[in-house]
C-alpha cells in the first residue's frame, strides 16, 4: 500500500473516498470541514446534530457526494472521546478505515491525520497510521485456488495535512511503521504456514533470508553440533521426529562499545503432537502454531536489522518437532541439559521448556547479559489470561517495567505473574534436579520458573504467548490466525535500551 502526505484541501481531493475523523461529542465542524459541508448541503452537520452519527470509536457512516465534490464518498469516522485517544487508537482507527474502504471497493482513500491535535508527535502519528494500515491489509490466502485476495483493497492512502513543516516527520514515521509492520507480517506468515511446509529446516532457511537481507551474522547448528555441546534436553524432544532439528543463532551488534547484549530466545516447535503423551485429536491442527515465540523473535530481528538501533542483540531459536515414535522420549526418562542439570520427564507434552533451556544456556555462552524468551508454553496461561494478555514471569522487576513500557508502545498487553519461592518447590524432582511439570496448579508460573533455573542470575523475562499468538477473529488491525504478537514489543524493548 502506498501512503503519503497530501496538502490539498479536503473538499478538492479526487479519491474514491475521503475519511473525516470526528470526536465523540463534537457539536461543530472546523472551518475546512464547514466549507465542504456547505457543498454537501449541510449533511455532515445534520448527521451530527441528529445523532445519526455520534463519533464513538470505530463508528462509521458513509455519505455519497453525488458529484458535489470530487470524491465519490465521504466516510465519517468516530474517533471516540478526545481524552481517550492514544497511540494504539491511531492504529485501530486506521485499520478500520482500510477494512471499511476495502468493503466498499475504494482503492484511493484520503483521510485526515489522527492524533496531531492531541499533541502526539507527527513521526509517531505517521508510524502508527502506517502500522494500522499495513497490518489491517494483511491476508494469508496463498493456498486458496479461488477467492484469493486479488489486490482489491486500498492501493493508495493519502494523509491530508496542511502544515508542511511536519511532513518530513510524518513521512519518517511512515517508513518506521512500514518496517514494524513488515516484521510483524513475517511472524504472522510463519505462524500461519502449515507444518508440512514450515519444517525446522524451512524455518532456518527463512532466518538465513532475514539475516542476509540486513547483513546480520547467522549460524545454524545441526543435530551433530548440538550433540557435541551436550544439548540433551533439546535433543531429547526431537528424538521421535524424522525432521532434523535446527538451532538458529542470529547476531546484531549496533553498539560495539556497549557490553550489554540482549538475548532473545524463541520456542520453535513447528509441530507439537505432544509426543508419547499425545494430545487429543480435536484442536491438534492448531499445534502448527507452537512456534509463535520463534516467529516473534525472527520478526523482531527483521525489524532490528532494518531500523538498526544502537544495541547488541543475540537471537536464538530452537526449531524442531515433538512426535511419537519408537525412538521418542518417554515419561519417566531423565534428560541432561547443556548446563548439566538433570530433568525428570513426567509429561512429554511439556516439551517447549526443554528446548528453551538449552537455547537459553547457548545464548548465555554466546555472551548474552540478559534474556527475554517467548513461547506458546502453557494452556494454563489461556485459563488465567484468555486471549488478551501475554503472561510474564521474571526475576527482575526493573526489567519488567521496561517491558511494560515497550508493550504499551506496541499496543500489546502484558502482565507479570508472581514468582514466590514456594512455586519453585513445585518443580523439584525426587530423582533428578528438576521435573518438567510442576505439581497441580500454577502451571504458567511453574513453567516460567523452570526456565528461570537456567538463566544463571541474569536479568530475565519469560513471555508466555499461548493465548495471544493467534487471533481468534478479525478485529482492529488483527486478522484471524497468527497475530505476530511480540515482534513490535521486542523491538521497542530493545530500542529503549540504547545507550
UniProtKB/Swiss-Prot annotation:
Instruction: Give the annotated active site.
Output: 279, 353
Query: Keyword annotations for this protein?
Result: Aminopeptidase, Cytoplasm, Hydrolase, Manganese, Metal-binding, Protease
Q: Name a single GO cellular component.
A: cytoplasm
Q: List the EC numbers from the record.
A: 3.4.11.1, 3.4.11.10
Alphabetized PROSITE patterns for the sequence: CYTOSOL_AP
Give a GO biological-process term: proteolysis
The record's remark on the cofactor is: Binds 2 manganese ions per subunit.
- Which NCBIfam families does the record match to this protein? PRK00913.1-2 (NF002073), PRK00913.1-4 (NF002074), PRK00913.2-3 (NF002076), PRK00913.2-4 (NF002077), PRK00913.3-5 (NF002083)
Role summary: Presumably involved in the processing and regular turnover of intracellular proteins. Catalyzes the removal of unsubstituted N-terminal amino acids from various peptides.
Name the UniProt record assigns to this protein: Probable cytosol aminopeptidase
Instruction: Supply the source organism for this entry.
Output: Alkaliphilus oremlandii (strain OhILAs)
What's the source species' lineage?
Answer: Bacteria, Bacillati, Bacillota, Clostridia, Peptostreptococcales
User: Gene symbol?
Assistant: pepA
Amino acid at each position: 500500500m502506498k501512503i503519503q502526505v497530501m496538502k490539498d484541501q479536503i473538499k478538492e481531493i479526487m479519491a474514491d473516498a475521503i475519511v473525516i475523523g470526528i470526536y465523540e461529542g463534537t457539536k461543530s465542524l472546523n472551518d475546512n470541514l464547514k466549507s465542504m459541508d456547505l457543498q454537501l448541503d449541510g449533511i455532515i452537520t445534520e448527521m451530527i446534530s441528529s445523532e445519526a452519527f455520534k463519533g464513538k470509536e470505530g463508528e462509521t457512516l458513509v455519505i455519497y457526494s453525488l458529484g458535489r465534490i470530487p470524491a465519490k464518498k465521504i466516510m465519517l469516522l468516530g474517533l471516540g472521546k478526545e481524552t481517550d485517544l492514544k497511540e494504539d487508537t491511531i492504529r485501530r482507527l486506521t485499520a478500520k478505515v482500510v477494512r471499511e474502504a476495502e468493503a466498499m471497493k475504494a482503492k484511493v482513500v484520503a483521510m485526515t491525520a489522527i492524533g496531531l491535535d492531541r499533541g502526539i508527535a507527527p513521526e509517531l502519528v505517521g508510524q502508527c497510521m502506517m502500522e494500522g494500515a499495513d497490518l489491517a491489509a494483511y491476508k494469508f490466502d496463498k493456498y486458496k485456488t479461488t477467492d484469493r485476495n486479488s489486490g482489491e483493497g486500498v492501493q493508495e492512502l493519502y494523509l491530508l495535512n496542511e502544515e508542511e513543516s511536519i511532513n518530513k516527520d510524518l513521512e519518517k514515521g511512515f517508513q518506521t511503521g512500514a518496517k514494524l509492520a513488515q516484521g510483524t507480517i513475517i511472524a504472522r506468515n510463519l505462524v500461519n504456514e502449515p507444518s508440512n511446509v514450515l519444517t525446522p529446516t524451512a524455518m532456518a532457511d527463512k532466518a538465513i533470508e532475514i539475516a542476509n537481507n540486513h547483513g546480520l551474522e547467522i549460524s545454524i547448528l545441526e543435530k551433530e553440533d548440538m550433540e557435541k555441546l551436550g544439548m540433551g534436553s533439546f535433543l531429547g524432544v526431537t528424538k521421535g521426529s524424522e525432521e532434523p532439528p535446527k538451532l538458529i543463532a542470529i547476531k546484531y551488534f549496533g553498539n560495539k562499545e556497549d557490553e550489554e547484549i540482549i538475548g532473545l530466545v524463541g520456542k520453535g516447535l513447528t509441530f507439537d503432537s505432544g509426543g508419547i503423551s499425545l494430545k487429543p485429536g480435536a484442536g491438534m491442527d492448531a499445534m502448527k502454531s507452537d512456534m509463535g515465540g520463534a516467529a516473534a523473535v525472527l520478526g523482531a530481528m527483521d525489524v532490528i536489522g532494518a531500523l538498526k538501533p544502537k544495541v547488541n542483540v543475540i537471537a536464538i531459536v530452537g526449531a524442531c518437532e515433538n512426535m511419537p515414535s519408537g525412538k521418542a522420549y518417554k515419561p519417566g526418562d531423565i534428560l541432561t541439559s547443556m548446563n548439566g542439570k538433570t530433568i525428570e520427564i513426567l509429561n512429554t507434552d511439556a516439551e517447549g521448556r526443554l528446548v528453551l533451556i538449552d537455547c537459553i544456556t547457548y545464548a548465555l555462552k554466546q555472551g548474552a547479559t540478559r534474556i527475554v524468551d517467548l513461547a506458546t508454553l502453557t494452556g494454563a496461561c489461556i485459563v488465567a489470561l484468555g486471549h488478551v494478555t501475554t503472561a510474564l514471569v521474571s526475576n527482575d522487576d526493573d526489567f519488567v517495567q521496561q517491558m511494560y513500557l515497550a508493550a504499551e508502545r506496541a499496543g500489546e498487553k502484558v502482565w507479570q505473574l508472581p514468582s514466590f519461592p514456594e512455586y519453585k518447590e513445585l518443580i523439584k524432582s525426587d530423582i533428578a534436579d528438576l521435573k518438567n511439570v510442576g505439581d497441580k496448579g500454577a502451571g504458567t508460573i511453574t513453567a516460567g520458573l523452570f526456565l528461570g533455573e537456567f538463566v544463571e542470575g541474569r536479568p530475565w523475562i519469560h513471555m508466555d504467548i499461548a493465548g495471544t499468538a493467534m487471533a481468534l477473529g478479525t478485529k482492529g488491525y488483527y486478522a484471524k490466525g497468527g497475530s505476530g504478537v511480540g515482534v513490535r514489543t521486542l523491538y521497542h524493548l530493545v530500542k529503549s535500551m540504547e545507550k
